[in-house]
């Protein structure tokens, strides 16, 4: 078995002369936790002992100073496997892979990660199997940068090591990773935004029909739009906080007083009047559990096939919610290059047309 090591080399230029190693690494977006972990790294490769931090081939401390022309070598070493993702033999549809990134096309019906009732047969387990049994690398820790629901298909991004996992997670939290979805939903979502003038507009009657939304009783009764809806040009924005339904494990709901911030942008709507459904493209600003499903249900346009949130199956072709992670944009953790990927719809969603 090969050791799971990620080594990065930095040639120090004049602009970084005089900085400590720690200060330099902070400029490269290394966190304190990452730097602290490097101090514990020690391994043997080709008969030579190496360390997590080396300057000009010698063990170095993070407080040591750098000079122009120095070669700083950083090594991340996986110490132990993630026990919750047991290796599982399952074909992987790899869209892109390099030293830091694994981008997969997830099929519907496969869990992204272990959870109650789905401890085996997960994509995380399949990735562990791929690296251990096929690539001969051990241990492997599956670092999913985002997740997809069991019956959602499409692009899923993984960081292959501590370095890429940390930087991609930073980007995810900062909103620098753009994920777009293609979906089919009942009705025409654009109708919910007619006459929308502000994201606080609300109809108490609509609110009652949509469940307990946590909307204050003091709001005017004359307004006729659900809260959290805003139209800017062609973009339809849903800003409606989401929380877990009390005494429910899976079910989520919109709740304006107690929910967590959740924002979904509908970028385009193609309505098919003869079929009474729409094909829509969406972009997430946040990543709450079931966010798209909850938000579309909230505006009265649940996903086709999403029985959990009110969407009955439309045709025999759809045995799941009609939701597909179709494109992703992010910056490569090592060189900052902008990465863009887009994949077509799976067959079951194509057959809806």
Annotate each language-model stretch with its function.
Residues 1-353:
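RNA pseudouridine synthases
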């Amino acid at each position: 078995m090969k050791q799971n090591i990620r080594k990065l080399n930095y040639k120090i230029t004049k602009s970084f002369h005089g900085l400590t190693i720690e200060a330099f690494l902070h400029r490269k977006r290394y966190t304190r936790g990452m730097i602290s972990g490097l101090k514990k790294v020690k391994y043997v490769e080709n008969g030579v002992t190496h360390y997590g931090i080396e300057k000009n081939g010698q063990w170095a401390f993070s407080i040591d100073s750098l000079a122009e022309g120095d070669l700083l070598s950083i090594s991340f070493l996986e110490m132990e496997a993630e026990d919750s993702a047991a290796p599982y033999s399952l074909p992987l549809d790899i869209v892109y892979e390099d030293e830091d990134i694994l981008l997969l096309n997830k099929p519907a019906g496969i869990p992204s990660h272990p959870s109650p009732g789905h401890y085996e047969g997960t994509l995380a387990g399949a990735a562990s199997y791929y690296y251990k049994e096929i690539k001969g690398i051990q241990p492997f820790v599956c670092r999913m940068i985002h997740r997809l629901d069991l019956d959602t298909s499409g692009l899923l991004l993984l960081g292959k090591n501590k370095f890429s996992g940390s930087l991609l997670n930073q980007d995810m939290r900062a909103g620098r990773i753009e994920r777009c979805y293609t979906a089919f939903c009942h009705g025409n979502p654009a109708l919910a935004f007619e006459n929308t003038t502000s994201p606080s507009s609300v109809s108490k009657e609509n609110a009652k029909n949509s469940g307990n939304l946590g909307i204050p009783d003091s709001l005017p009764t004359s307004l006729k739009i659900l809260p959290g809806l805003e139209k800017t040009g062609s973009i339809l924005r849903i800003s409606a906080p989401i929380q877990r339904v009390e005494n429910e494990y899976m079910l989520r709901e919109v709740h304006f007083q107690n929910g967590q911030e959740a924002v979904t942008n509908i970028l385009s709507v193609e309505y098919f009047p003869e079929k009474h459904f729409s094909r829509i493209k969406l972009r997430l600003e946040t990543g709450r559990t079931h966010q798209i499903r909850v938000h579309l249900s909230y505006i009265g346009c649940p996903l086709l096939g999403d029985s959990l949130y009110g969407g009955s199956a439309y045709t025999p072709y759809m045995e799941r919610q009609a939701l597909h992670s179709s494109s992703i944009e992010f910056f490569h953790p090592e060189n900052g290059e902008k990465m863009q990927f887009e994949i077509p719809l799976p067959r079951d969603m194509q057959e809806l047309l």
